[in-house]
């Protein structure tokens, strides 16, 4: 067998083997992911049909109108029917792709329809880790998430250092978590199982390890798990601050109590820098620092007292937004949720005003 044929066979085998992998976005385990799967497959099939039609016509025209000795030069002239066809068909194609896409994107912003009330989980990214605070249950986990199946989960996304992207491929698409604000993202697991979650936004040398495990369980098993976690160590501020450091190893942890008892990351984006200071942690460029010197001077214990809850976000101060602190013995009730909603509406208004101002500055709003 020639070298070319061997390479061709090897290449063909690799293509076939790629179909054996478990592509997570096509292995949907929730309603949001299922609608995304349909949209992707619909778009692929639709565009393949267009490609086959265009390439088929291309082949026919090459064969039928190829040059030969008896060929006559064609005479170009106006044809209203043909011009209408090649003007209308692209519009139909764009509409057929755009309408379901836009509709699906707007549907993502609404919680999936369910008879059960949605539960709330604060998903906070920091130090190349994910922190999950359960305000109703007053428990917190690190790099692991447990949710009941068939119940919508409203994730309140926050970032304490760099911008990240929260993504559980088998449950739905990604959404950004940014400093100084809270973004809502609702997902639901329709089956029990263990899924992978990750930060899909490249944001530094620790990006690849910012992953977490998602356990979707029955409501009975979820209640049992919550009871077990409540019996574990209570999360104190020293422990939380140390976990914020990129130098602290990424491990799956579970705590009684939450960080919401002493910090609101959206209201206090400067909190993490104080945590760095407490443990003498300094950000260093990995390109110019040896591995042994990256975290050489980091203290194992805090050197200064813990920071009190406060507002350092200028937007919070300017617009009278409230500091959201929930003690471990305080209920996550309608009064707290009302203040949450008020902050969210104010932040949305700030974002819209900034966008309008940007449009005015660049002429995009006219």
UniProtKB/Swiss-Prot annotation:
Lipidation (S-diacylglycerol cysteine): 20
InterPro entries named in the record: CcO_II, CcO_II-like_C, Cupredoxin, CuRO_UO_II, Cyt_c_oxidase_su2_TM_dom, Cyt_c_oxidase_su2_TM_sf, QoxA
Lipidation feature positions (N-palmitoyl cysteine): 20
Alphabetical GO biological process terms: ATP synthesis coupled electron transport
Molecular function GO terms recorded: copper ion binding; cytochrome bo3 ubiquinol oxidase activity; cytochrome-c oxidase activity; oxidoreductase activity, acting on diphenols and related substances as donors, oxygen as acceptor
Keyword Zinc among UniProt keywords: no
Composition-biased stretches (Basic and acidic residues): 335-366
Keywords: Cell membrane, Electron transport, Lipoprotein, Membrane, Oxidoreductase, Palmitate, Respiratory chain, Signal, Transmembrane, Transmembrane helix, Transport
Leader peptide range in chain numbering: 1-19
Catalytic activity as recorded in UniProt: 2 a quinol + O2 = 2 a quinone + 2 H2O
PANTHER family according to UniProt: CYTOCHROME BO(3) UBIQUINOL OXIDASE SUBUNIT 2, CYTOCHROME C OXIDASE, SUBUNIT II
Family, similarity comment: Belongs to the cytochrome c oxidase subunit 2 family.
Protein name: Probable quinol oxidase subunit 2
Species assigned in the record: Staphylococcus aureus (strain NCTC 8325 / PS 47)
Gene name of the encoded protein: qoxA
């Amino acid at each position: 067998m020639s070298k070319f044929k061997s390479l061709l066979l090897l290449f063909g085998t690799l293509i076939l083997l790629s179909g054996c992998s478990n592509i997570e976005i096509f292995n949907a385990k929730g309603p949001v992911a299922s609608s995304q799967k349909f949209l992707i497959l619909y778009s692929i099939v639709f565009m393949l049909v267009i490609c086959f039609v265009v390439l088929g016509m291309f082949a026919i025209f090459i064969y039928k109108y190829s040059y030969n000795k008896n060929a006559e030069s064609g005479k170009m002239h106006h044809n209203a029917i043909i011009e209408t066809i090649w003007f209308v068909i692209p519009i139909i194609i764009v509409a057929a792709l755009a309408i379901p896409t836009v509709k699906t994107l707007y549907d993502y912003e609404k919680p999936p329809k369910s008879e059960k009330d949605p539960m709330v989980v604060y998903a906070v990214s920091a130090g190349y880790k994910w922190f999950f605070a359960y305000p109703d249950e007053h428990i917190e986990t690190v790099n692991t998430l447990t949710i009941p199946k068939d119940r919508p989960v409203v994730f309140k996304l926050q970032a304490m250092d760099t911008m990240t992207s929260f993504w559980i491929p088998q449950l739905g698409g990604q959404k950004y978590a940014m400093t100084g604000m809270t973004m809502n993202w609702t997902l639901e697991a329709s089956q029990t199982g263990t899924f992978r979650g990750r930060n899909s936004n490249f944001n530094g040398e620790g990006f690849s390890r910012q992953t977490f495990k998602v356990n979707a369980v029955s409501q009975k098993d979820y209640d049992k798990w919550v009871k077990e976690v409540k019996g574990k160590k209570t999360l104190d501020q020293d422990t939380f601050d140390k976990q914020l450091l990129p130098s602290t190893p990424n491990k799956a942890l579970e705590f009684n109590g939450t960080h919401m008892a002493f910090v609101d990351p959206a209201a206090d984006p400067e909190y993490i820098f104080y945590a760095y200071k407490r443990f003498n942690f300094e950000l260093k460029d990995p390109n110019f620092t040896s591995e042994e010197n990256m975290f050489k001077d980091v203290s194992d214990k805090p050197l200064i007292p813990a920071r009190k809850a406060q507002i350092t976000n200028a937007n919070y101060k300017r617009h009278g937004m409230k500091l959201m602190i929930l003690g471990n013995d305080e209920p996550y009730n309608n009064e707290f949720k009302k203040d949450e909603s008020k902050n969210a509406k104010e932040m949305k208004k700030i974002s819209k005003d900034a966008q309008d101002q940007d449009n005015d500055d660049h002429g995009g709003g006219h």
